[in-house]
Amino acid sequence: MGGGGGSSRFDPIDTTQSSKEEICAIVEAAADWGTYVAAHTFNDRAVARLLDCGVKSFDHGFFISEETMRNIATAGGFVVPQMWGISPDMAKTPLIPPSKIDEVLALGEEFKDFGRQLLRNGVKVVFASDYVGAFSDAERARRYEIWWRTQTFDSNYEVLKQLTSTAGELLALSGPRNPYKDGPLGVIEEGAYADLLVVDGNPLEDISVIGGTEQWFDADPEFKLISTIHLVMKDGKIYRHEIDGRLSPEALTFEDYNYQGIIGDYIPDN
């Protein structure tokens, strides 16, 4: 924890936590294991201290200045925001007491350009779903987050990168601890992990085809099948296949299917 939290009873959101000596010791210990450190933080003072020690990933960060954003970008850091936290729909959550609703709406209005500012200052952004409350609400929040980011970053393409290739870059910083050492994640290229979705539609135009929805608390939980996703492949194994009208939820190797007959027509040569 580099600072407090939004829903923490004894942990004010504006605070800076852990001394520089403590943080640097944590980063040194992580480096000894060949990996990096992520920190939960919201403000400039906390981020400056964390950057000085070599922290690479910053959760939330809503209150940081554009100068701090540029410092993160220069240091090769990543910001992992939870954009639902500055959504006007936050006022509808049962987790927010009525006395706090006006404050939540005011914060959302004040920091409505946070996503655009991150991109403008060259910060790499990764998708995440930090949430409080019931598990089912967290599942719904994840799908809402996908949609809400398309509104706050003004780009479906950017959101898709946050979900895939940029997240793969961050995970690669874990070095020997990285469970995906055999190739890059989140890209389609020779030598990369064969992680693919085949969907009915174009997520660059309509993010709902991969599950994004502007519904939140009244949305279906994520564990229900998304009808527009017809094939799920992870590391070359097919976990779900509906392209020819059949559902195959079990893991099957790539060779178990007639690639040209079943999959080839759905993936362009380029």
Region spans (language model):
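Short, glycine/charged-enriched secondary-structure capping and boundary segments
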Residues: 52-54, 72-73, 94-95, 140-143, ...
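Short Asp/Glu-rich motifs
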Residues: 49-50, 69, 90-92, 137-138, ...
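Short, electropositive alpha-helical surface patch
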Residues: 20, 50-63, 134-151, 193, ...
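Active-site core of metal-dependent hydrolases
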Residues: 3-113, 124-134, 200
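Intein/HINT protein-splicing elements and their conserved insertion hotspots or analogous self-processing inserts
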Residues: 242-270
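Extracellular/periplasmic catalytic domains that process cell-envelope and extracellular macromolecules
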Residues: 41, 50, 71-73, 118-120, ...
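C-terminal cap of metal-dependent C-N hydrolases
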Residues: 177-182, 190-252
